[in-house]
């Protein structure tokens, strides 16, 4: 049970780091690029500083290079925390944003759709299974083109997502909702704030991650 909860917690927060994946899974590579008018700049040496109430500070840097994984172009990022520096991958195609990486405790590769630049009310669900136990991550576009203030700074052109988290009932027979939260992304910036909470079989956790500083090159 503790492993399942740790798995869930680790993939809950977008800002969490992901271990570098064997790039033989994909092919190619090249210089990064992409307009900053979307929700994830990828230009080389762009930087973001975050603070998580659970995990402490983190520093993310866009490497400005990419690789092809599962036929999709993924941009490379390094994130440094007190535990060290790890590699993450982000894909953005036609307004659909994905993240990809290894989850160490079970050695499983995970690919998540974490954002869609779609109409209000659009929703989608990522299903992730480990050893026959599945959890479900539902995102809904709640608001678009709003202002949102984080650590005293007001961001424009923000999209707000609501998040619902459900798991297979380990006692069998149903899926139960155990938590949820919200995510905020600003155009030309990226993730600016995320928070969540969950409670499952007597174990609960909350986290808020906020953007402190950023530089887009």
Annotate the PLM regions.
Residues 13-16:
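C-terminal motif of bacterial Sec signal peptides marking the signal peptidase cleavage site
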């Amino acid at each position: 049970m503790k492993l399942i909860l740790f798995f869930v917690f680790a993939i809950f927060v977008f800002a969490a780091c992901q271990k570098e994946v064997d790039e033989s899974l994909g092919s190619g590579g090249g210089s990064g690029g992409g307009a900053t008018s979307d929700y994830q700049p990828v230009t080389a040496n762009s930087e973001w500083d975050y603070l998580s109430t659970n995990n402490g500070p983190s520093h993310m840097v866009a490497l400005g290079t990419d690789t092809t994984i599962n036929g999709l172009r993924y941009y490379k990022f390094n994130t440094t925390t007190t535990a060290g520096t790890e590699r993450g991958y982000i894909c953005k195609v036609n307004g659909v944003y994905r993240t990809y990486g290894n989850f160490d405790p079970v050695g499983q590769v995970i690919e998540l759709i974490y954002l869609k630049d779609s109409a209000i009310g659009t929703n989608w669900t990522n299903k992730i299974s480990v050893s026959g136990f599945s959890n479900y991550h539902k995102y809904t576009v709640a608001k678009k083109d709003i202002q949102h203030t984080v650590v005293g700074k007001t961001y424009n052109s923000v999209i707000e997502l609501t998040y619902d988290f459900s798991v297979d009932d380990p006692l069998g027979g149903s899926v139960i909702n155990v938590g949820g939260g919200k995510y905020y992304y600003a155009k030309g910036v990226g993730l600016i704030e995320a928070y969540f909470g969950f409670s499952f079989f007597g174990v609960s956790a909350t986290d808020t991650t906020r953007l402190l500083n950023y530089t887009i090159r």
